[in-house]
Amino acid sequence: AERLHFMDFDIADVPAKVDTGAYRSAVHASDISLSDDGVLTFTLLGGHPVCGTMAQTYSTKDFKIVWIANSFGHREQRYEVKLRVRLGPKVFPATFSLADRSKKIYPILLGRKMLNSRFIVDTSNSSINRIELKKEYNIEFPLDEEEGR
């Protein structure tokens, strides 16, 4: 796991899970709505137990609707937006599907599409310990993403 920074929101040090099995990246969002004039509005990181006061509302006309399949084969439609991020020393635009990750330890999932040609993944190394993160924010889920596979 790593820490991600959203450059246009002045949001820093958000815990993110690297998942080379996932194609797309996902970010926790709440209050997602689409207006009649085509403006998508959502609260980035709103309501996630790890994010506290980081939440910010964002509106955009620059989005896509994509189909996402989870590891169990269930497919769902989601909105996908482009956000400028910093991961390590690199700043770049990345696409994220908007998802309810409130029951997941990590509010962000980093998939292959974002990592490809930018990073080499060392699976033996992590800058965040999942157990320490759960203790720090007093998170107890009966079944989280790591234990559910």
Where are these regions (language model features)?
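Pepsin/retropepsin-fold aspartyl endopeptidases
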Residues: 1-149
